[in-house]
Amino acid sequence: MAKGGFPGGFNINNMIKQAQQMQEEIKKMQEELMQKTVEATAGGGMVKAVANGRKELVSIEINPDVVDKDDVETLEDLVLAAVNQALRNAEEMIASEMAKITGGLNIPGLF
């Protein structure tokens, strides 16, 4: 039996080393994701929302043509739609980057 190993070739030391390496890669990826952004639009581009890789909204742009004081509800709906889609896009970006590191394993609580 190999040092640090178990019958059948399982080596706890290698497993710990791999986990530490994955942890370092995840930390690096989290830092990189802070710099990446995704955007979404609503109303044919009248409202644009931008989110970063931490699922934080970083900007909202509203075309002045969509602002109507007599129809605030439409503007509210457009903002909600753009923000929600931007956050979904950020989630997809994060999942895609995580899959590169974890090989597609779903590890709860990483983000």
From Swiss-Prot:
Primary site of residence: cytoplasm
Where in or outside the cell it occurs: the entry states: Cytoplasm, Nucleoid
Pfam families from the UniProt entry: YbaB_DNA_bd (PF02575)
Annotated GO molecular function terms are: DNA binding
Cystine pairs:
none
Q: Which NCBIfam families match?
A: DNA_YbaB_EbfC
What the protein does comes down to: Binds to DNA and alters its conformation. May be involved in regulation of gene expression, nucleoid organization and DNA protection.
Binding partners and assembly: Homodimer.
Q: Matching HAMAP family, A to Z? A: DNA_YbaB_EbfC (MF_00274)
Name of the protein in its database record: Nucleoid-associated protein Teth39_2199
